[in-house]
């Protein structure tokens, strides 16, 4: 939930369609699990042993995390908009 990806037209309440896979390319939008806890949908960019989680809304900060802290759940394919 939230509007961190509004710049990619992914709105609060949309249902994301995710293809389960752990591989990705930089700048793909992926579903990520952070610290075996929270799930988020962000663009990702890999830098050696760091990963940047990049929102498409400039009002949200980029999170830079050690790669071991995240699990790539899958790649974003599209969405279903309710309403």
Predicted segments — roles?
Residues 1-83:
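Acidic/glycine-rich C-terminal interaction modules and beta/coil loop segments
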């Amino acid at each position: 939930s939230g509007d961190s990806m509004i710049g990619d037209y992914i709105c609060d309440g949309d249902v994301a369609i995710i293809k389960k896979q752990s591989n990705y390319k930089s700048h793909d939008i992926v579903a990520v699990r952070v610290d075996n806890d929270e799930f988020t949908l962000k663009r990702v960019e890999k830098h050696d042993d760091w990963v940047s989680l990049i929102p498409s809304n400039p009002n949200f900060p980029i999170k830079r995390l050690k790669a071991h802290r995240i699990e790539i759940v899958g790649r974003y394919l599209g969405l279903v908009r309710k309403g």
